[in-house]
Structures are given as C-alpha cells and as structure tokens.
C-alpha cells in the first residue's frame, strides 16, 4: 500500500476527522496517484483533443503548399508540394500589406479599448453621479444588440464623418475600420467589477496622499487590475484581428 493510501485509510478510521475531510482524502488518493489504465485513458483523451484542435491548422498549412488544381482533392497526406501559392500571396496578393493593416487596426483598437474601459469602469465603480446604475445597465443592454443589426448605421456614420483625407478617415481607411470598436461595454463591465474589489481604505489613503482621479487610476488602480486588463487586451486584439464582415463593407 502506498503512502497516500495509508494516509487516506488513517483519515477514514480516525473518529476525530470530519466526513468532509474523509471524502476529500479519498478523492485526492484516487486522482493524485492514478493507476496505469486511468493514466493511459487520461493521456489518450488529451491526445485526441489535441489532434482535433490541430487538424484545421494542419489542413490549412497543407492547402497553402498544395497546387491550386489539387486543393479540392481532400488528401490528408501531403503529395506534391509547391511554394507558388505562398509566393503569389505575398507578391501579387499583397498579403504582407494586409497583415500589416490588420495588425495596426487591432493594436489601435486594443489600446483605445483599454483606455476607455479603464476610465468608464472607474467612473461606474467609484464616482458618484445621478443615475449611475441606470447608465451602467444601459451600457450592458447594448450587448444584447448584435453587431449585424448596427452595421448599416455604423457604415453611414463612418461615411458621414469624412473622406480619406479627414482625421476620421471615412470609408477605405484604417480609421474607418477601427472607429466602431474603440469602446466596448464588455471592457467596461470587466474593469468595473475588478475595481469594485479594491478596498475603500486604499482609495481614501490615495486621497490623503494628494492623488486625484487620474493619479489613482495610473498609480494604484492599473497595477492592481493588471490581470483583467491583460485578459481584455487579448480578447480585444483577437476579436479585432478575426473580423470579416466590417472590413469587407468598409474597404471596397
């Protein structure tokens, strides 16, 4: 009998140990030291899940190096490989420029969402103004409206704000691609919830030290809610990078 089994047995036999601790000790024994069959089943399941996740990536890479006339043959194993497709994408298709544009727009949107979410989240968490909760719930209600329902209005707004030479960009511009996504209700909600967990004594101490609202946000709040901001930045960048409908409409 292993040491863990001996400890679990002792915990079960000890009348001074509560029933909750007995169950916990038995559960820990079963999963901390799995048998060979259970360990093989666990790793087998992980391998299957990994293959399912990587299969679309594999087919995409395989299709990129397969001649155009053989892409639809649905072959799992690589046959004739060529770099012509990738080369044409970079030269004739200007893929490098498109990737750079996507990166610039995604970075700008991420930066603006972090700033606007931090400011609005702080306002809803620690500032006192009339109808604060009502305005916050109105922010959250915008999440119920799908983006497709506002596409026409956003498109008209971007077109009305100006052409490519104006500061707002308009259609066929990087500003037009980023404009509808510079602020997000999801970011406001996440930052507000994180700021509500800060102790009130910390805020009062910062006031005694002479920090204003912006000073508190920059020196105290931002370092403490860094995990939330990191998650928001990752979500914002990926969602902006993966957009298709809005760029397809704005860029003609």
What would you call each of these model-derived segments?
Residues 1-46:
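Transmembrane alpha-helical segments of polytopic membrane transport and secretion proteins
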Residues 38-252:
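A structural signal for multi-pass alpha-helical bundles of membrane permease subunits
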């Amino acid at each position: 009998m292993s040491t863990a089994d001996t400890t679990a047995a002792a915990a079960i036999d000890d009348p001074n140990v509560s029933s909750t601790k007995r169950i916990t000790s038995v559960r820990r024994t079963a999963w901390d030291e799995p048998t060979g069959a259970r360990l093989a089943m666990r790793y087998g399941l992980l391998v299957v899940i990994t293959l399912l996740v990587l299969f679309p990536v594999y087919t995409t890479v395989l299709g990129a190096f397969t001649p155009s006339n053989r892409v639809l043959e649905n072959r799992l194993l690589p046959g004739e490989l060529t770099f012509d497709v990738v080369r044409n994408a970079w030269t004739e298709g200007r893929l490098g420029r498109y990737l750079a544009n996507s990166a610039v727009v995604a970075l700008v949107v991420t930066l603006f969402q972090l700033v606007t979410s931090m400011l609005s989240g702080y306002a809803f968490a620690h500032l006192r103004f009339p109808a604060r909760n009502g305005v916050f719930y109105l922010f959250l209600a915008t999440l119920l409206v799908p983006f497709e329902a506002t596409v026409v209005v956003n498109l008209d707004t971007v077109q009305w704000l100006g052409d490519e030479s104006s500061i707002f960009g308009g259609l066929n511009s990087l500003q037009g691609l980023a404009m509808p996504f510079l602020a997000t209700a999801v970011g406001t909600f996440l930052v507000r919830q994180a700021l509500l967990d800060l102790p009130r004594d910390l805020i009062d101490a910062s006031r005694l030290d002479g920090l204003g609202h912006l000073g508190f946000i920059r020196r105290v709040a931002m370092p403490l809610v860094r995990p939330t901001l990191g998650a928001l930045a990752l979500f914002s960048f990926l969602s902006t990078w993966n957009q298709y409908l809005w760029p397809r409409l704005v860029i003609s």
